[in-house]
Amino acid sequence: MGPIMSTGETSTAHTVLGCQITDKTVITLFVILVFSCLVAVVGNGFIIIALGMKWLLRRTLSAHNKLLISLAASRFCLQCVVIGKNIYVFLNPSSFPYNPVIQLLNLMWDFLTAATIWFCSLLGFFYCVKIATLTHPVFVWLKYRLPGWVPWMLLSAVGMSSLTSILCFIGNHMIYQNYARRGHQPWNATGNSLRHSLEKFYFISIKIIMWTVPTVIFSIFMSLLLVSLVRHMKKTLLALSELRDVWAQAHFKALLPLLSFIILFISCFLTLVLSSASSTPYQEFRYWMWQVVIHLCTVIHPIVILLSNPVLRVVMKRGCC
């Protein structure tokens, strides 16, 4: 995942490239991780192709679908980076976690992770404004203004994600430069002091701040949306008592994708924070466990989108026939 990994101590979870790999648990987790990422790549790739074809045919795309295709594209690229990085660290478990190869992979990972979180947040904000049955003048005004803001919102998200990745890259590069100056000795006390300080304060602060802001925005607006939908559902069921079962099922189907979106997003955010806060060497079981948990969360949501979005569902049925 992020750059805060430690290899000061040599673990024997699995051996270095060229030697026999003995830890079956690590191998199993690695296979599960790669398979999960491949499923996510296929799911997000299908969303990109379906919406991209619609964009080409109609020469336009709704604001909602622009957000959706941006989220799918960021997740697609993120899963490809995750596969590449984890294949590299699986084959080179004792490599220095700030070497040039991992620096480049971390730069892409930091950018795409931040972009994915921001796009999810913007999608949640969009859902709230367009779907919520709130009558406050601000919400009524936003309903008409929001579609025109979507391109600028996406550009702002890309800008914030770029800032996150650049700040993290600066810290990564400082650690590697210090490591190179001291003769590539990861156990050097002075070098480790700088490294541990940056890992403990600099990286954690940047990531938690940059990830928490969009998560708070997402949580606030999705909470407003759920409250609005529950109130609307209660009023509808009371007014139409003879159709109560039919309406209850319809509302439940509408709420289910939103609830899954919220649960998966919050789960992924918490897992990212917890994994970033722990300095886990690449060789250890915990590193691979965190990876599997994080990316299982990101695998499920594209499937939910495919099953709940009418346009994508029709395209998927045509493709299967």
Swiss-Prot record:
Signal peptide: none
Segments on the Cytoplasmic face: 50-75, 128-149, 229-253, 308-321
Segments passing through the bilayer: 29-49, 76-96, 107-127, 150-170, 208-228, 254-274, 287-307
Principal subcellular localisation of the protein: membrane
One Gene Ontology term from the biological process aspect of the record: detection of chemical stimulus involved in sensory perception of taste
Cysteines engaged in disulfide bonds, as pairs: none
Record GO cellular component, one term: membrane
Assigned keywords, A-Z: G-protein coupled receptor, Glycoprotein, Membrane, Receptor, Sensory transduction, Taste, Transducer, Transmembrane, Transmembrane helix
UniProt keyword Secreted, yes or no: no
Sequence ranges on the Extracellular membrane side: 1-28, 97-106, 171-207, 275-286
Compartment(s): Membrane
One Gene Ontology molecular-function label: G protein-coupled receptor activity
Entry membrane topology: Multi-pass membrane protein
InterPro entries: TAS2R
Glycosylated residues (UniProt): 188
Superkingdom assignment: Eukaryota
PANTHER family: TASTE RECEPTOR TYPE 2 (PTHR11394), TASTE RECEPTOR TYPE 2 MEMBER 60 (PTHR11394:SF32)
Misc note: Several bitter taste receptors are expressed in a single taste receptor cell.
Family to which this protein belongs: Belongs to the G-protein coupled receptor T2R family.
Its biological purpose: Putative taste receptor which may play a role in the perception of bitterness.
Designated name of the protein: Taste receptor type 2 member 135
The organism of origin for this protein: Rattus norvegicus (Rat)
Gene: Tas2r135
